[in-house]
Amino acid sequence: MSTATTTVTTSDQASHPTKIYCSGLQCGRETSSQMKCPVCLKQGIVSIFCDTSCYENNYKAHKALHNAKDGLEGAYDPFPKFKYSGKVKASYPLTPRRYVPEDIPKPDWAANGLPVSEQRNDRLNNIPIYKKDQIKKIRKACMLGREVLDIAAAHVRPGITTDELDEIVHNETIKRGAYPSPLNYYNFPKSLCTSVNEVICHGVPDKTVLKEGDIVNLDVSLYYQGYHADLNETYYVGENISKEALNTTETSRECLKLAIKMCKPGTTFQELGDHIEKHATENKCSVVRTYCGHGVGEFFHCSPNIPHYAKNRTPGVMKPGMVFTIEPMINEGTWKDMTWPDDWTSTTQDGKLSAQFEHTLLVTEHGVEILTARNKKSPGGPRQRIK
């Protein structure tokens, strides 16, 4: 999936043995191979591949690295022929996969990229109902997720790179004895999703530098003692924010808030989308249809699927003990999306802005509990629109 090298930071070298990961964009697995790209070697770059077949299958994307003027320190676009919809572009090379201590419990995809238990559960197509002892553990994971997101959000400012934010999230996650759920999930290369401006979701942290006036979504997920937490918020970068960015972001924030108010036993998952889209439309925005909320807890993603758009046909009724996310992606322009050649980054087709907010929620006997709720010290928060 990602382009990774064997380079590690000095601190990592001092405390951990170097782990080698395949540099293939569609691979990224740990390997003991010593097969190196000869072109990279001439430029002082060490890029290792699993075998000849992996090298040949990934070479078309990998060769973009050879065009970097300053080796690993020089930022470059790995997809120079790709027609981006807006100004945000991939900025490579990606930093190497970050180390997770051996003693931290890991989900099954940490080893090979495949969430086998999740795939097996998907075939059952049932919505988990969690017991009190399980809910206690999910609540703890969500509390840690909120801590990590707030720490990363406090560093959002002009001049910081999305990769630096990823490093913060990674370090704060493992400091708490948790595993960053996105890392190696279907070979996703990072511990955080960072979505800037027209990026809807699943942005890969790289050398992109945040600028005054940007908006950036930080999507944090972690795995702690067998359970996942999932939350995200969109933050303003600096103070000089356009009225379009303010309206799109605040509309998304409000859409999540009104959807949460509907959550209680007996509410259908289908009706959430009707109210979300109504509010978005009233504010001259649209709702992304490709991605949806989902069950979370024992699994990173599971039933129910929760679309955020109107007139959807998703089945299911809320019952006490259900845990899921609501995460409306609201666009300034068209609802239609497109995906970059990295097979992850989703952006608006028209290059206009997108904003998202997400909470993990527990249905109680009489309503809902926001497991990932903000606290008084949480960075960010609403701002007044500009008329």
From Swiss-Prot:
<feature type="binding site">
    <location>
        <position position="230"/>
    </location>
    <ligand>
        <name>Zn(2+) 4</name>
    </ligand>
</feature>
<feature type="modified residue" description="N-acetylserine">
    <location>
        <position position="2"/>
    </location>
</feature>
<feature type="binding site">
    <location>
        <position position="22"/>
    </location>
    <ligand>
        <name>Zn(2+) 1</name>
    </ligand>
</feature>
<keyword id="KW-0645">Protease</keyword>
<feature type="binding site">
    <location>
        <position position="202"/>
    </location>
    <ligand>
        <name>a protein</name>
    </ligand>
</feature>
<keyword id="KW-0378">Hydrolase</keyword>
<feature type="binding site">
    <location>
        <position position="219"/>
    </location>
    <ligand>
        <name>Zn(2+) 3</name>
    </ligand>
</feature>
<feature type="binding site">
    <location>
        <position position="294"/>
    </location>
    <ligand>
        <name>Zn(2+) 4</name>
    </ligand>
</feature>
<keyword id="KW-0963">Cytoplasm</keyword>
<feature type="binding site">
    <location>
        <position position="327"/>
    </location>
    <ligand>
        <name>Zn(2+) 4</name>
    </ligand>
</feature>
<dbReference type="GO" id="GO:0008270">
    <property type="term" value="F:zinc ion binding"/>
</dbReference>
<comment type="similarity">
    <text>Belongs to the peptidase M24A family. Methionine aminopeptidase type 1 subfamily.</text>
</comment>
<feature type="binding site">
    <location>
        <position position="50"/>
    </location>
    <ligand>
        <name>Zn(2+) 1</name>
    </ligand>
</feature>
<dbReference type="InterPro" id="IPR031615">
    <property type="entry name" value="Zfn-C6H2"/>
</dbReference>
<feature type="propeptide">
    <location>
        <begin position="2"/>
        <end position="10"/>
    </location>
</feature>
<feature type="zinc finger region" description="C6H2-type">
    <location>
        <begin position="19"/>
        <end position="73"/>
    </location>
</feature>
<dbReference type="GO" id="GO:0004239">
    <property type="term" value="F:initiator methionyl aminopeptidase activity"/>
</dbReference>
<dbReference type="InterPro" id="IPR002467">
    <property type="entry name" value="Pept_M24A_MAP1"/>
</dbReference>
<dbReference type="GO" id="GO:0003729">
    <property type="term" value="F:mRNA binding"/>
</dbReference>
<dbReference type="GO" id="GO:0010629">
    <property type="term" value="P:negative regulation of gene expression"/>
</dbReference>
<keyword id="KW-0479">Metal-binding</keyword>
<feature type="binding site">
    <location>
        <position position="230"/>
    </location>
    <ligand>
        <name>Zn(2+) 3</name>
    </ligand>
</feature>
<dbReference type="GO" id="GO:0005829">
    <property type="term" value="C:cytosol"/>
</dbReference>
<dbReference type="InterPro" id="IPR036005">
    <property type="entry name" value="Creatinase/aminopeptidase-like"/>
</dbReference>
<feature type="binding site">
    <location>
        <position position="301"/>
    </location>
    <ligand>
        <name>a protein</name>
    </ligand>
</feature>
<dbReference type="GO" id="GO:0016485">
    <property type="term" value="P:protein processing"/>
</dbReference>
<keyword id="KW-0862">Zinc</keyword>
<dbReference type="InterPro" id="IPR000994">
    <property type="entry name" value="Pept_M24"/>
</dbReference>
<dbReference type="Pfam" id="PF15801">
    <property type="entry name" value="zf-C6H2"/>
</dbReference>
<keyword id="KW-0863">Zinc-finger</keyword>
<dbReference type="Pfam" id="PF00557">
    <property type="entry name" value="Peptidase_M24"/>
</dbReference>
<feature type="binding site">
    <location>
        <position position="62"/>
    </location>
    <ligand>
        <name>Zn(2+) 2</name>
    </ligand>
</feature>
<feature type="binding site">
    <location>
        <position position="358"/>
    </location>
    <ligand>
        <name>Zn(2+) 3</name>
    </ligand>
</feature>
<feature type="binding site">
    <location>
        <position position="66"/>
    </location>
    <ligand>
        <name>Zn(2+) 2</name>
    </ligand>
</feature>
<keyword id="KW-0031">Aminopeptidase</keyword>
<feature type="binding site">
    <location>
        <position position="54"/>
    </location>
    <ligand>
        <name>Zn(2+) 1</name>
    </ligand>
</feature>
<feature type="binding site">
    <location>
        <position position="40"/>
    </location>
    <ligand>
        <name>Zn(2+) 2</name>
    </ligand>
</feature>
<feature type="binding site">
    <location>
        <position position="27"/>
    </location>
    <ligand>
        <name>Zn(2+) 1</name>
    </ligand>
</feature>
<feature type="binding site">
    <location>
        <position position="358"/>
    </location>
    <ligand>
        <name>Zn(2+) 4</name>
    </ligand>
</feature>
<dbReference type="InterPro" id="IPR001714">
    <property type="entry name" value="Pept_M24_MAP"/>
</dbReference>
<comment type="subunit">
    <text>Associates with the 60S ribosomal subunit of the 80S translational complex.</text>
</comment>
<dbReference type="GO" id="GO:0070006">
    <property type="term" value="F:metalloaminopeptidase activity"/>
</dbReference>
